[in-house]
Amino acid sequence: MTENQQLTALVAACHWIGEKGWCPATGGNMSVRLDDAQCLITESGKDKGSLQTEDFLLVDIATNHVPSGRTPSAETGLHTLLYRREPTIGAVLHTHSVNATVLSRVEKGAELVLHGYEMQKSLAGQTTHLDRVVIPIFDNDQDIPALAQRVTEFASHTPLRYGFLVRGHGLYCWGATVKEARRHLEGLEFLFQCELQRRLLEAKA
């Protein structure tokens, strides 16, 4: 895809995310890789449901430098970290949905394990509900470099797949393309809602 096609796809994904209510109050951030050296990421403080192409900033993946001098998302470092570590990642979507935020707090451990759901097959490489889908959970931190370091340490021994949760904060998910990242986001949101409902019903039983 050309740069314009990639950006058009990402803008459409942002509008869809806004309609879903997954990034309220200008929260969240989205990006797309242009090549090995550069990505485009949302400018800070923009409503995701009404983004336009001019609301995305060019960022150097190696240094986080923004040639325009404008202010990118505060969490730019997590996007560029993912692009550096995983060359196959082509787009990153970070959302603040209720399901992701609450489930990341309800689950007290370091990971959320999903098992037995047909929708697991929405994730690349998943072929059966019998497998386990493991979503890491990292404690929230306003110090983004410190949070990025914890993600780096995790990734040094465990491959990053599909996404991770930041406790009380939201979901980071990705894909080889904007289209795949969007499918992963929709699939994970469905799975999170199912898991929350399951836990709620079991607690009442």
From Swiss-Prot:
GO terms for biological process: L-methionine salvage from methylthioadenosine; monosaccharide metabolic process. PANTHER family: METHYLTHIORIBULOSE-1-PHOSPHATE DEHYDRATASE. Gene3D superfamilies: Class II aldolase/adducin N-terminal domain. It comes from Pectobacterium atrosepticum (strain SCRI 1043 / ATCC BAA-672). Pathway: Amino-acid biosynthesis; L-methionine biosynthesis via salvage pathway; L-methionine from S-methyl-5-thio-alpha-D-ribose 1-phosphate: step 2/6. Keywords: Amino-acid biosynthesis, Lyase, Metal-binding, Methionine biosynthesis, Zinc. Its EC number is 4.2.1.109. Catalyzes the dehydration of methylthioribulose-1-phosphate (MTRu-1-P) into 2,3-diketo-5-methylthiopentyl-1-phosphate (DK-MTP-1-P). Its cofactor is Zn(2+). Zn(2+) binds at H94, H96. Binds 1 zinc ion per subunit. InterPro entries: Aldolase_II/adducin_N, Aldolase_II/adducin_N_sf, MethylthioRu-1-P_deHdtase_MtnB. It catalyses: 5-(methylsulfanyl)-D-ribulose 1-phosphate = 5-methylsulfanyl-2,3-dioxopentyl phosphate + H2O. One of its GO terms (cellular component) is cytoplasm. The gene is mtnB. Pfam families: Aldolase_II. HAMAP family: Salvage_MtnB. This is Methylthioribulose-1-phosphate dehydratase. GO terms for molecular function: methylthioribulose 1-phosphate dehydratase activity; zinc ion binding. The keyword Amino-acid biosynthesis applies.
